[in-house]
Regions:
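Glycine- and small/polar-enriched repetitive beta-structure motifs of secreted/surface proteins
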Residues: 1-191
Length: 191
């Protein structure tokens, strides 16, 4: 164990192979293993309800409420301030960028997502297999599945669409708003 910072790994009882650096980093972690938590309150609730293993959370509040309420969070990489903040029990996610995959509230269990960029997929809750790369790409996705968006604000309003592809600045920007769905749609270029 390596704990540097006020109340870093504060609650540890039977954990090993963890690194926590920063104010209250890994604060609630009790028995989880193989986690790297760097930043103020990074992984703060990790290990609260069950054993969460093999996570990397770097940035202030990155993964702050992971494992806060229900199940364990495993195999996640959250890099950036607030990346994956409310991702309660999601597994195998990669969120890179400020507010990437931030989510809201507890009970979020998105799995197997790749969200890269400032606020990429920031509203995600239970969506799975989402790929979003770009500034606010897939910004509003909550429960969508298997969508791919590449570009500035691509699929911005697509909350629940499935299997859509958007490539380009604002590609598919309006779909998902006002009852529209981006189910199986393909958007190329700017809109």
């Amino acid at each position: 164990l390596i704990a540097i910072g006020y109340q870093a790994l504060y609650s540890v009882t039977d954990a090993d192979n963890n690194i926590a650096i920063g104010y209250q980093a890994g604060y609630s972690l009790t028995t989880a293993r193989y986690n790297v938590l760097i930043g103020d309150q990074a992984g703060y609730s990790l290990g609260t309800s069950s054993e969460s293993n093999e996570n990397v959370m770097i940035g202030n509040s990155a993964g702050k409420f992971a494992d806060a309420a229900t199940n364990a969070a495993h195999y996640n990489v959250y890099i950036g301030s607030n990346a994956g903040t409310y991702m309660d029990d999601g597994d195998s996610n990669v969120y890179i960028g400020r507010d990437a995959g931030k989510g809201s509230g507890t009970g979020n269990n998105a799995t197997a997502n790749i969200l890269i960029g400032y606020q990429a997929g920031t509203a995600i809750s239970t969506g799975d297999a989402e790929t979003a790369v770009g500034y606010q790409a897939a910004y509003s996705v909550t429960t969508g599945n298997s969508n791919s968006s590449l570009g500035y604000r691509a699929l911005y309003y697509n909350e629940a669409g499935t299997a859509a592809v958007a490539i380009g600045t604002n590609a598919g920007y309006m779909f998902g708003r006002g009852g529209h769905s981006a189910q199986g749609s393909i958007f190329l270029g700017s809109t």
